[in-house]
C-alpha cells in the first residue's frame, strides 16, 4: 500500500479533509465529491501516480487502476485520523 505521505498528498490535493464530502470507488477510479473545485491541486494529487484526473463540477475521478480499493481504504483511514 502507498505510504501515508502519498495518501496525504491526495487529500491535500482535493482541498483537505474539510473540502471532501464523500469518497467512493469503482473498478479503477477513486470517486470523490468535494465542496469547492477551486481548492483542487492536481500537482499534489499527481504525487501518487495515476493515469488521469476527470473533473466535472464538484465530482472528481482519479484513475488509479486495480489498486484503487486499497487507495480508497487508505484515504478513508487517514481522513478518520485527522
Regions found by a protein language model. Name each.
Residues 4-82:
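Membrane-embedded alpha-helical signal segments
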